[in-house]
Swiss-Prot record:
Primary role: Has chemotactic activity for neutrophils.
GO annotation, cellular component aspect: extracellular space
SS bond partners: C37-C63, C39-C79
Protein known as: Growth-regulated alpha protein
Superkingdom assignment: Eukaryota
GO molecular function: chemokine activity; growth factor activity
UniProt GO BP: immune response; inflammatory response
Gene it is expressed from: CXCL1
CDD domains noted in UniProt: Chemokine_CXC
Family: Belongs to the intercrine alpha (chemokine CxC) family.
Protein species of origin: Cricetulus griseus
Coiled coil: none
Amino acid sequence: MAPATRSLLRAPLLLLLLLLATSRLATGAPVANELRCQCLQTMTGVHLKNIQSLKVTPPGPHCTQTEVIATLKNGQEACLNPEAPMVQKIVQKMLKSGIRK
């Protein structure tokens, strides 16, 4: 192939790749969601009977704080304050009963 033809074929290919890369951002899809804390605000407690599962994320490179995320029976997720005595009791009860995600 001639060099001029080759560069004419490259331009549409590069444009297509650029469009594909930006379309993911345009749809609002999360990009690298795990690279930051998930809990921006926390609650001091929630009633144990409303919790379906519990996820405890230790501190790491993504977030310097321990995060406790409760999935409620109505499907909502709630960030709980891991320092709150009520939350610590909930975590201990869930660990003992084995209902941990």
